[in-house]
């Protein structure tokens, strides 16, 4: 059979017969012949002829399997799954601990290969795709300086790479990161407090505010609570406060967690379907930031003793 695709951009597409059953193919002008090379439970690896970009992608996948030592990793996975099927938690923990160095080494080897491959393909769409899919999302864009440096770096990609959708996707994300970077005015947050009254972040303008994004079900979030209490005590009477922000769906669990953890500061429960993760560029919780009296973000991703040490740099 034949597919005719009107695609003006050279880009990676998913080719399959139904969602989750298929694999990736680089779309480019010409007559591409596609047949399955390997079919696994996790999807299909397509063999594509008549395409320079797909040859580059195929060669990268083969090299990646070698440097990562995928055969060894597959055998370790099999051992872990066998122990899991037996519900042998002790054996699962042992395998996980002893396997970790191999996975870390594999990730380091893959990262090195990715960077080398990107450097060798700065002029073509494959290079920008690989950069976007493997490296871009793992970079730190918490400051305006980092965002500016990233925009400058992307200018190094050639004209053909600049015409791909990946540049537009990254620019859109950088614009979003700029809105929640250190030095930017913290976006407004609105919701209800523990008594059901309206509350918003700007109510605390004029104070230093630790904003703690958390949920009652998040174990790691609640482990930060003792450190937050220390911060509240350390800066008592110094124009400082804490605002907990949660998107808990069950108000009773949210209230119970606040009471149980002795989180004796202001709390805000977000309205349903509030996309706070996008607004604040949050990749996971806990996500704790410091906002200054002027409403600007002073610090991000604070943990443990940083909840006292970082504000101390600003509060005198």
Regions found by a protein language model. Give the residues of each.
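Conserved redox-active cysteine motifs that mediate thiol-disulfide chemistry
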Residues: 205-206, 213-230
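A non-transmembrane, solvent-exposed segment enriched in polar/low-complexity residues
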Residues: 1-109
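N-proximal helix/coil linker or "cap" segments that precede and/or mark the start of modular domains
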Residues: 145-192, 197, 202-207, 233, ...
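Amphipathic alpha-helical repeat scaffolds of TPR domains
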Residues: 120-137, 168
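Alpha/beta-hydrolase fold active-site loops
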Residues: 208-209, 286
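Thiol/disulfide oxidoreductase modules built on the thioredoxin-like
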Residues: 262-263, 270-315
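Structural microenvironment flanking redox-active thiols in thiol-disulfide oxidoreductases
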Residues: 222-261, 271-278, 309
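Short coil/turn connectors between adjacent alpha-helices in alpha-solenoid helical repeat scaffolds
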Residues: 101, 138-146
